[in-house]
Amino acid sequence: GIIEFRRLLIGNGVNMLGSSIFIIGMSWTVAQIGGPKIYGLIFTAYFLGHLPLLLYGGMVVDRMPRRTVALVADLSQAALVTLAIIALMAGMDEIKTLLVVTFLTGGAGAFSIPAIGALVPDLVEEDLLPQANAMRGVAMTAAWMFGPLIGGVTVGAWGIEVCLLLDVITFLFSG
């Protein structure tokens, strides 16, 4: 019911906060190293991982427990970003590492996004759906408003690895 919806709302808001921190950290890092062409390539990699799996992700969400799908997707993204941190700290190529992790997390997001969206009607009564969806929209907007600020300060002060670590923490929190 409402308590589960609140948990979903907070978890999803925190998850979006982490995603926006990641995007700003990655964007700044890529802009410094590779320039606008690489920046565009990184975003293309995300959607190449995401779009082909989105319909399949929706079918999986319709056939499996939605919470399980969301949890597995969030934990998968946390594991992928953790591997990226390890790779970057080991001195691996930043651009290639970010390309791979962005592609793979895009694929995992193709399961997470439909699962979270489908959970809302499961958790609130039909007459409360408009308010629930509005609250979810406010939480997402707030996350996308504050995340870039946090991401910019973080990447400027401590580098991309700390931005990625914050993203991992938010995936674990939301899961």
Positions of predicted regions on the chain:
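Alpha-helical transmembrane-bundle signature of multi-pass membrane transport and export proteins
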Residues: G1-G175
